[in-house]
UniProtKB/Swiss-Prot annotation:
Transmembrane region(s): none
A cellular-component GO term for this protein: cytoplasm
Organism: Mycobacterium bovis (strain ATCC BAA-935 / AF2122/97)
Job of this protein: Required for the formation of a threonylcarbamoyl group on adenosine at position 37 (t(6)A37) in tRNAs that read codons beginning with adenine. Is involved in the transfer of the threonylcarbamoyl moiety of threonylcarbamoyl-AMP (TC-AMP) to the N6 group of A37, together with TsaD and TsaB. TsaE seems to play an indirect role in the t(6)A biosynthesis pathway, possibly in regulating the core enzymatic function of TsaD.
MF annotations from Gene Ontology: ATP binding; metal ion binding
Listed GO biological process terms: tRNA threonylcarbamoyladenosine modification
Name listed for the protein in its UniProt record: tRNA threonylcarbamoyladenosine biosynthesis protein TsaE
Protein location: Cytoplasm
Family statement drawn from the similarity comment of this UniProt entry: Belongs to the TsaE family.
Residue sites binding Mg(2+) per the record: T58, E132
UniProt entry tagged with the keyword Metal-binding: yes
Gene (UniProt): tsaE
Region spans: Disordered: 1-21
């Protein structure tokens, strides 16, 4: 059951439907990309962030949260697995920020069980779910999801981001 009053936009999104690539030389550029992506998200969307340690996944999640105007500091939820960030404005979705990094040593059945125990699917109608390290798993939460891959350029602070909409 969804909360009344949450605005839902049509699933077609101008500018993001085909995906894209961006070079991000500064942290501010990663925040800006996150904000740009965040402006296009609506309740029910799942965003899967992947890339090596230090690639900028949490920074991108901060940018998404800035655009969504949700409460609380956005920090990596590695040790608590998931954090709910409530919307500051009525009629806008919450953001659930998930990080499954510490579960990666588990076998895939255990990992799916842990992910399932978070009951994220119950939040999908009223929230945008952003999952760090969820590649190959989080996509199962929604038929339509945004995949964002961040890579670090060797011997540089520059990151390369690639994103596309996927279907499960």
């Amino acid at each position: 059951m969804s909360r009344e009053g949450i605005r839902r936009r049509p699933k077609a999104r101008a500018g993001l439907t085909g995906g894209g690539t961006a070079t991000l030389p500064r942290v501010e550029d990663t925040l800006t990309l996150g904000s740009r992506l965040g402006e296009q998200l609506c309740a029910g969307d799942v965003v899967v962030l992947s890339g090596p340690l230090g690639a900028g996944k949490t920074v991108l999640a901060k940018g998404i949260a800035m655009a969504m105007d949700v409460e609380g500091p956005i920090t990596s939820p590695t040790f608590v697995l998931a954090r709910m960030h409530r919307p500051r404005r009525p009629g806008t979705p919450a953001m659930v920020h998930v990080d499954v990094y510490r579960l990666l040593d588990h076998n895939s059945a255990d990992l799916l069980s842990e992910l399932d125990s978070l009951d994220l699917d119950t939040d999908l109608e009223d929230a945008v779910v952003v999952v760090e390290w969820g590649e190959g798993l989080a996509e199962r939460l929604s038929q339509r999801h945004l995949d964002v891959r961040l890579e670090r350029v060797s011997h540089s602070d520059t990151r390369i981001a690639t994103w596309s909409w996927g279907r499960s």
